[in-house]
């Protein structure tokens, strides 16, 4: 575990939250600032460098979020051991864990843009001459969008 400097997790990135067209540019980030604010800043810089930056939303990162998504996905076992993480998601939708999910509902352009952001973030982390600083400042409360 000591050799792992960060964990980037993607889950449910091909749809818009609640299938709202207004969410077509949004990706929700969870945990990016909880363990390492440096990792958070690396991700923000990677997004700013994209040809078409995404709207970064931290609503699900709020400790008061009722869904408690920070504790519900594959990244959490790393975070619990102190590894800086970012969970990229587009939120829940009507077909979440249902048999009504169809390929025709996937927003492939959005999926590709988010995947590019994850890649660019990973490359920037890999090219650091140090592991992202683990300052453990914790999440920012409230909804934040960039």
Residue ranges, per PLM feature:
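His/Asp/Glu-rich mid-to-C-terminal helical/loop segments that flank catalytic regions of hydrolases
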Residues: 89-146
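Metal-dependent peptidase/peptidase-like ectodomains
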Residues: 1-87
């Amino acid at each position: 575990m000591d050799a792992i400097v960060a964990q980037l997790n993607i889950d449910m990135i091909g749809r818009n939250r609640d299938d709202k067209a207004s969410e077509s540019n949004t990706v929700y980030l969870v945990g990016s600032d909880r363990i390492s604010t440096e990792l958070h800043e690396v991700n923000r810089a990677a997004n700013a460098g994209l040809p078409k930056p995404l709207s970064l939303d931290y609503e699900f990162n709020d400790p008061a979020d009722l869904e408690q998504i920070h504790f519900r996905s594959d990244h959490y076992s790393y975070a619990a051991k102190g590894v800086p993480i970012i969970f990229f998601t587009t939120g829940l939708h009507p077909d979440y864990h249902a048999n009504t999910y169809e390929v025709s509902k996937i927003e492939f352009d959005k999926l590709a843009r988010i995947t590019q952001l994850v890649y660019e973030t990973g490359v920037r982390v890999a090219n650091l001459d140090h592991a992202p600083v683990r300052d453990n400042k914790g999440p920012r409360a409230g909804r934040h969008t960039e």
